[in-house]
Amino acid sequence: MLPKLVITHRVHDEILQLLAPHCELMTNQTDSTLTREEILRRCRDAQAMMAFMPDRVDADFLQACPELRVVGCALKGFDNFDVDACTARGVWLTFVPDLLTVPTAELAIGLAVGLGRHLRAADAFVRSGEFQGWQPQFYGTGLDNATVGILGMGAIGLAMADRLQGWGATLQYHEAKALDTQTEQRLGLRQVACSELFASSDFILLALPLNADTQHLVNAELLALVRPGALLVNPCRGSVVDEAAVLAALERGQLGGYAADVFEMEDWARADRPRLIDPALLAHPNTLFTPHIGSAVRAVRLEIERCAAQNIIQVLAGARPINAANRLPKAEPAAC
């Protein structure tokens, strides 16, 4: 009898074909997010779960699913999943590194350009029927001759800097550990203090993971430092930013604009998270938002799902997964 795998969100048909010889599949091939109660009902006798960004696995969940052996996350950031609880229950927690790096960096730059050039308002103007031909309007901010500050210089921050070559911008960054001199010189990067980055950048791009140190790192105190009209772009994690502080900075005219692909309401592991995006923030004209599509490139999503599936297959075969967030004592290393 094949082990049971619960897949909580829609995946490509190719992934179902890959998994079918190894598992009894219980899928969700709709565009609806299953409730926690429904996922629990499906997982009570399951040996494996393929999880996605809206899902949350904690000690209570694992206790209700005693046969679970692996939670294979089709994502990179696993802050909604309790690593210690999985380890204590002997459940592998796996993730997919690296594949989200390039599309997230691309989207960040796209959001920066769109925000600076007022693409949201310009698009609405054309669609309204009011456009009758060229007029001197929608003057914005370009990347050429601008100072771009990147907060965080992990894989995504590096990918942002790499893709900003040739845009004519001056690049600076803040990271607890400085890059090596060769990398700084190759990318034209200058390390500055976090406060200086906020005070001297025309564009501020966030490239941080979410953890106890970074939650609400971008707060009222930091936003009070920005030069008037500066633009803030968040493609990383919603709760890195205090959205209430962002709204206040927008309303007083200090922050020139805010673009985001991620929102505080998505960070399920936070008991105090907002349950929705503030309507006043959504309505503010100097904002540009996308619905967490940083990895929404078909080829990328397919490969993310394939890697998540392969991690699950490895565990169900008695081997170590290729990319694990935790360490368990048993099982042989996987053959990559």
UniProtKB/Swiss-Prot annotation:
Keywords: NAD, Oxidoreductase, Stress response. Optimum temperature is 35 degrees Celsius. Optimum pH is 7.25-7.75. Belongs to the D-isomer specific 2-hydroxyacid dehydrogenase family. InterPro entries: D-isomer_2-hydroxyacid_DH (IPR050223), D-isomer_2_OHA_DH_cat_dom (IPR006139), D-isomer_DH_CS (IPR029753), D-isomer_DH_NAD-bd (IPR006140), NAD(P)-bd_dom_sf (IPR036291). SUPFAM superfamilies: Formate/glycerate dehydrogenase catalytic domain-like, NAD(P)-binding Rossmann-fold domains. Gene3D superfamilies: NAD(P)-binding Rossmann-like Domain. NAD(+) binds at A155, I156, E175, P235, C236, R237, D261, H292, I293, G294, S295. Homodimer. GO terms for cellular component: cytosol. It catalyses: phosphonate + NAD(+) + H2O = phosphate + NADH + H(+). Induction: By phosphate starvation. This is Phosphonate dehydrogenase.
